[in-house]
Structures are given as C-alpha cells and as structure tokens.
C-alpha cells in the first residue's frame, strides 16, 4: 500500500510544472528553516533561562549562515542575559553588510567585535574578517573580547575552535557553544 501511495505521489510531482514544483520546494524549505530557527532559539532560551546561567554564548556558522542568522538573531530579546559571540565563515567583505542588516532588524545590538571591548548581555559580537575572536576576564571579572591573527596556519580565520576553547578556558561550565550550519570540522574540537 505504501508503495502505491509513493507511486501516486511521484506521478503527481512528475506532471507538475517545473515552476510550481520549485515554488513548493522553496516554501517547504523556508518553513523548515523557520521551524529549525524557532527550535534552535527555544533550546538556547531553555538553557540560558534554566537553572544554570551562562556568562557567554558562542555561535559557529558557515554555509547557509546569513539565512540562518537572519531567522535566528531576530528572535533574541534585548534582555537576553548573556553576550553572544559569532564566528561566521564567509568571503571577506560580506560580513559588514550582514552585521548592519541584523542590527537594523533586531532587538539585540549586533556589531563587529573590537579588541578589548567589554562584552554586554543582549548584544551579538561578530568576529571580523581574518581575526580570531577570543575572550578574557578583567580584574573586575568583566568579559572582554580579544582579536588576533594567532594561531596561524589554521584552515579558518576566524576559527570556531579558537573561540570555543577560549570560552571554555575563561567561563568553564558557564559557557554555551552552538554550531548552527556548515561543513568541515571547525568548532567540533
């Protein structure tokens, strides 16, 4: 019976005009992307608002990043209780536009990270092109950003591995790492 239903569905798709099929596939992909972004946000929110409080959140994103971020970041309230760092693998020169577009359409402040900048809750900080983004604590226990081109020789700069290792060293169990999209192994070490 299942095979008959599959064959019937295949026959309907085969007779469907290409434009209509493309439009249906596109709308299903958009619905799936929106649902995925909503679920990702709910998981993140449950972790951040749960019994455990995070001092810092890091997001690694690559292929499909601008679209995923465009669905995810607008869901964050201005009252989000931790700063969020983002490493986006993208062709140099495109990141400024993404940051501006997100900042203009979100409740949270979205900006490019600067060296030595105090990281504030309710703000998203992107690693600039060709700079690793790490964090440090000041003597007053504030978290600040550090930008560097070291270590050299990595496939990706900025590197999610470098960011996540820094977060773990500084915040320990009070950090949360999120890998949203991509390819390769950056961020899984």
Which residues are covered by each model-predicted region?
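Conserved acid/base catalytic micro-environments in cytosolic active-site loops
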Residues: 1-189
């Amino acid at each position: 019976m299942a095979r008959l239903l599959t064959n019937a569905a295949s026959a309907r798709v085969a007779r469907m005009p290409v434009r209509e099929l493309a439009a249906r596939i596109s709308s299903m992909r958009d619905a799936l992307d929106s649902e995925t972004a909503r679920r990702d946000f709910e998981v993140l929110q449950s972790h951040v608002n749960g019994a455990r409080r995070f001092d810092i959140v890091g997001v690694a994103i690559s292929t499909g990043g601008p679209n995923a971020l465009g669905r995810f970041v607008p869901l964050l309230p201005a009252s989000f209780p931790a700063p969020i760092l983002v490493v986006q693998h993208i062709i140099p020169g495109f990141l400024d536009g993404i940051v501006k577009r997100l900042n203009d359409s979100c409740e949270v402040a979205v900006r490019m990270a600067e060296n030595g900048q105090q990281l504030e809750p309710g703000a998203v900080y992107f690693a600039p092109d060709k700079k690793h983004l790490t964090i440090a604590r000041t003597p007053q226990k504030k978290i600040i950003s550090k930008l560097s081109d070291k270590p050299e020789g990595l496939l990706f700069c900025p590197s999610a591995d470098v960011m996540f290792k820094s977060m773990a060293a500084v915040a320990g169990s009070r950090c949360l790492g999120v890998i949203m999209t991509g390819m390769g192994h950056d961020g899984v070490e």
